[in-house]
Amino acid sequence: MLSAFTEAVRRSGGRAVCLVAILLTVGRQDRLSAQGFLSQFSYDNLKPSALQLDLGPVGGNNIRGTLTGGLRLDYGFIAPHVRVLLGVSYYKADFSSAARARFEQRLKSVVIDPSADDTIRLGPITWSDVTGDVDLQYVLPQGRAVITYLGIGLGAHIRHGSGPAINGTFVQDALNSITAGLNGTIGAEVGANRWRFTLEARGVLSSGVSTGSLRSGVMYRWAGSRDKRPGTPK
């Protein structure tokens, strides 16, 4: 009986040791995979390599369509096929009629009007937006002269509202804001030399107004970076 008990303990202990060994092996493989992934990221290749100017139409959920322009700096590759872009852009758009009507209704709901016969007319309102953003773009070469990319990034939006009826009032103060946004991009570059043509669709999710734009522009890639393949080390 004692020998049977000893044999059972031995088998149970053996199974436990095997299980621990398997878990340690899997855990070690996961750590090695994570270390291998992180080792692909490096700051060594980060340096200004190209400058881009773009212009195109933009529309949003609370504004009328207008034009937007931007300036972008390609800051090199932080990982294979992953580059960093720093950008600034600007637009100035009119409030849409529906957005202005909703805003007037919200103001009316907080105004004390005993006779209930007052009306609020804000008139034309414009909203300007200055954005600074950082994008990570995954670059997919399609040949020597064409590059496509997908990107995601974060932006800071400085907005300013203005209009003849609201300037200097609390309404203008309510429209002035600084907020964050999430960017998504898809685009292409065409050209094998220093000068390249760019085409990009960009969507922005942010508080107050979310926008979509289609921009075209030119990029100048200076010497030392034009022949460098995406993601290759120095």
PLM feature spans:
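Short glycine/proline- and aromatic-enriched beta-strand/turn motifs that initiate or cap beta-hairpins
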Residues: 33-80, 223, 234
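Structural signature of outer-membrane beta-barrel domains
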Residues: 58-60, 89-95, 155-161, 204-208, ...
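Gram-negative (and chloroplast) outer-membrane scaffold detector with strong preference
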Residues: 72-164
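Residues on the lipid-exposed face of transmembrane beta-strands in outer-membrane beta-barrel proteins
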Residues: 53-57, 69-75, 88, 132-138, ...
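Outer-membrane beta-barrel "beta-signal"
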Residues: 211-234
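Outer-envelope beta-barrel architecture signal
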Residues: 43-51, 80-84, 144-150, 178, ...
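Solvent-exposed loop/turn segments connecting transmembrane beta-strands
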Residues: 57-67, 144, 204-215
